[in-house]
């Protein structure tokens, strides 16, 4: 009697054939995603002579306004943004619009790459104060370039460009569009990501035990078994333990891949995803230019500290024109902290507070919409969540490999059964022929 085609069998077929169709692409995307998880930490470690400073005992940082003046004088350019880390042994990052005969694009750092992708793919992103806000743009005088500055003596230790940074840029290109930026790579990655969502869901159906007494098997790997059993358990168990994080990665990553998807998510949340990309600072009144002394950056940072009284990282964005304003984003730093930034804007001529945005005061839907990037990258809760994302992405990288091995083993088993069946038929036919002859 023919077996009924069950939902479980349907899920198995979906899981198998979609996995075969997308396995190679998903392997590349997950592997590069794993590598990119700790991009910032690896770059700063590999190029530590640029990013790390040792302060002498009792040394104090140069006041920020003096540091800006010294940097502008030394580089003969205009500072358009600053990143000030909470770590006292880390350099400041200054984005400088250098004077030159030709304007251009700002130097791309990790955050700038991610911003440029906001409208298209699963990109990771840091560097430069524009990383989580709007990146400083090049103008008539030249492009914005990110310099690393020692806050204790004002020396420039280098820029964010290096062989290590170039390596991660290549990893980003693979992760985002398989190095096929203008040849449909984004669509291929996006389609594979949609398939991945179905693979995770169908895999969960297949993991679900038919009998209650088999629940325990789904939570552990039987290392005492043969290699086929271990491979099966690795695929089954690691997939289960990581499925929640993998779904979050995939569902948020699609916001870069397809505009229609991003629009749909924005409609569901009731708030625009990546709206920071188009959001303009509050306007300043140019009529105030001659009526007041220009505010000191130190006083603006002090005012931000009063609104957000905690130790953290700062990202300062300077006014882009006579009607622009100063924007300061402040975020917590630590092993297990919510890294979402609070934001405050100041009138550029008077230093008056124009707008204060505290992340915790936002409605939940706006918090989610503004956290899509962090939910995809895994830095939503600092190093703690990055470790979890790293492991989940590493597990995901192994799934196409272990899944392919399971499929090959089943094919071999099926072929052996078919061969054994043919041999039985042949023996039976020979026996019948012998009987007839006798």
Predicted regions and their residues:
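Conserved histidines in hydrophobic membrane contexts and catalytic metal-binding motifs
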Residues: 1-438
């Amino acid at each position: 009697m023919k077996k009924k085609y069950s939902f479980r069998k349907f899920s198995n077929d979906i899981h198998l054939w979609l996995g075969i169709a997308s396995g190679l692409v998903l392997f590349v995307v997950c592997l590069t995603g794993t590598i990119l998880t700790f991009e910032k930490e690896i770059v700063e470690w590999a190029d530590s002579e640029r990013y790390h400073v040792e302060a002498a005992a009792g040394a104090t940082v140069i006041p920020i306004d003096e540091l800006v003046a010294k940097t502008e004088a030394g580089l003969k350019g205009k500072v358009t943004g600053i990143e000030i880390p909470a770590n006292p042994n880390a350099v400041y990052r200054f984005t400088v619009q250098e004077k030159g005969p030709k304007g251009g694009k700002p130097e791309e750092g990790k955050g700038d790459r991610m911003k440029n992708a906001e409208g298209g793919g699963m990109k990771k992103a840091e560097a430069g104060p524009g990383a989580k806000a709007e990146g400083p743009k090049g103008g008539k005088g030249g492009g914005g370039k990110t310099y690393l500055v020692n806050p204790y003596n004002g020396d420039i230790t280098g820029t964010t460009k290096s062989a290590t940074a170039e390596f991660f840029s290549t990893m980003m290109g693979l992760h985002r569009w398989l190095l096929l930026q203008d040849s449909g790579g984004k669509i291929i990655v996006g389609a594979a990501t949609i398939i991945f969502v179905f693979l995770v869901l169908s895999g969960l159906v297949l993991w679900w035990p038919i009998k209650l007494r088999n629940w325990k098997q789904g939570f552990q790997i039987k290392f005492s078994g043969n290699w086929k059993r271990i491979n099966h358990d690795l695929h089954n168990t690691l997939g289960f333990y990581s499925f929640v994080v993998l779904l979050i990665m995939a569902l948020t990553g699609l916001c870069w891949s397809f505009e229609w998807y991003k629009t749909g998510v924005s409609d569901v949340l009731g708030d625009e995803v990546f709206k920071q990309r188009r959001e303009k600072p509050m306007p300043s009144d140019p009529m105030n230019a001659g009526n007041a002394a220009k505010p000191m950056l130190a006083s603006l940072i002090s005012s931000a500290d009063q609104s957000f009284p905690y130790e953290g990282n700062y990202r300062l964005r300077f006014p882009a024109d006579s009607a622009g304003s100063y924007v300061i984003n402040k975020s917590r730093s630590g092993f297990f902290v919510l890294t979402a930034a609070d934001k405050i804007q100041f009138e550029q001529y008077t230093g008056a507070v124009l707008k204060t945005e505290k992340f915790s005061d936002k409605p939940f839907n706006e918090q989610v919409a503004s956290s899509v990037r962090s939910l995809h990258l895994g830095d939503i809760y600092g190093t703690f969540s990055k470790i979890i994302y790293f492991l989940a992405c590493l597990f995901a990288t192994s799934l196409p490999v272990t899944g392919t091995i399971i499929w090959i083993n089943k094919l071999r088993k099926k072929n052996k059964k078919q061969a054994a069946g043919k041999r039985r038929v042949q023996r039976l036919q020979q026996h019948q022929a012998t009987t007839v002859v006798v």
